[in-house]
A protein has these predicted regions:
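N-terminal active-site segment of His-dependent metallophosphoesterases
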Residues: 4-5, 11-75
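Active-site environment of divalent metal-dependent phosphoester hydrolases
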Residues: 34-38, 64-67, 94-98, 149, ...
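Divalent metal-coordination and catalytic microenvironments
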Residues: 32, 61, 91-92, 158, ...
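Short hydrophobic-aromatic micro-motifs
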Residues: 29, 150, 154-161, 224-226, ...
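A general structural motif
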Residues: 24, 51-54, 83-85, 152, ...
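Acidic, His/Gly-rich catalytic cores of divalent-metal-dependent hydrolytic chemistry
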Residues: 183, 192, 196-291
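A short acidic-Thr-Gly-centered motif at the start of a beta-strand
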Residues: 16-23, 48-49, 80, 147-150, ...
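Active-site neighborhood of divalent metal-dependent phosphoester bond hydrolases
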Residues: 65-197
């Protein structure tokens, strides 16, 4: 069989492209883990995660509901110690632990165990167990979490966006000069599910006349990848992609992947069990998996 020069050149170019892509950075965005460490490890294996090449981003809520919250934080810290580029965006459950830390930091720094009932009221049924396992470096990781992360045309945050928040996502933590009302509005990024029709953030107990925040998003921050709202599969609407696929409720843990050539897709693994120490949402929204 004759092999022509053009064929050899084509094969060489394909090999060069494969090598180039291998050493280029992928973006891996992981949905709400909620202490499901086994599933996180399985998902990273499925993705063939490369600690020295890939950029790993979590949409928040590593803690609560699942069985291994403290161990998950420790695992993420180990990835960072191994040289991985790991960005952990703050979720509302992470915020609960930070509020607890701010209130009882002196006691925690002395490694005094807070009362079980106090932890359960503040953090949930497994809060006491998790608090007693957290190390100093775990608290440092939690304290370092940004409210959002932006790279290229993708913005990662936990909850949602309001068009009334005018600053860029990368500036959201630089908020010392903001009014207390503005800071509260910015922190709502962790909690938002719905907005008023004028785009403003509703009060906590407000329910009438609200619309999903995704309906009002105008694309100003590019693609928004978020968690917080558990769905049966990836939820795509407009320029928003929800990747909390309810792993702690026995469904799946999902990662959105952006390849070096900007191709976007997702991978997921099945949950090993129903873990959540609370009832599931009344209805897990159906997702849409096509762009």
């Amino acid at each position: 069989m004759c092999i022509h020069f053009e064929d050899i050149l084509k094969i060489q170019m394909e090999l060069i492209t494969l090598r180039f892509n291998y050493f280029m950075t992928r973006l891996l965005v992981i949905g709400d883990v909620h202490g499901c460490l086994i599933e996180l490890e399985n998902l990273l294996r499925k993705l063939r995660y490369r600690v020295e090449q890939d950029r790993l981003v979590f949409v928040g809520d590593l803690l609560n509901k699942g069985p291994s919250g403290a161990e998950t934080l420790s695992f993420v810290n180990d990835l960072k110690d191994d040289g991985g580029e790991v960005i952990y965006v703050r979720g509302n459950h992470d915020e609960k632990y930070l509020q607890f830390y701010n209130q009882f930091s002196n006691r925690l720094r002395k490694e005094e165990k807070p009362p079980r009932r106090l932890c359960q009221v503040w953090l949930g049924p497994d809060g006491h167990k998790t608090i007693n396992k957290l190390k100093s470096r775990d608290w440092r990781l939690l304290l370092s979490t940004p409210l959002s992360f932006q790279t290229g045309n993708i913005t990662v945050l936990h909850g949602g966006l309001s068009s009334k928040i005018h600053c860029k996502p990368k500036h959201l933590l630089d908020s010392k000069s903001f009014s207390s009302k503005r800071r509260a509005e910015i922190k709502s990024l962790m909690y938002i599910r719905h907005l008023r029709k004028d785009g403003t953030v509703p009060n906590q107990n407000e329910t009438k006349g609200l619309v999903p925040w995704q309906d009002l998003y105008d694309g100003r921050f590019g693609w928004v990848v978020y968690g917080h709202q558990p769905t049966s599969c990836v939820f795509h609407k407009g320029k928003t992609i929800g990747i909390d696929t309810a792993c702690c409720y026995g469904n799946r843990l999902t990662a959105l992947v952006q390849e070096p050539d900007s191709q976007i897709y997702w991978e997921s693994v099945s949950a090993k069990s129903y873990y959540a120490n609370c009832s599931p949402p009344k209805r897990l929204r159906n997702g849409a998996t096509a762009f």
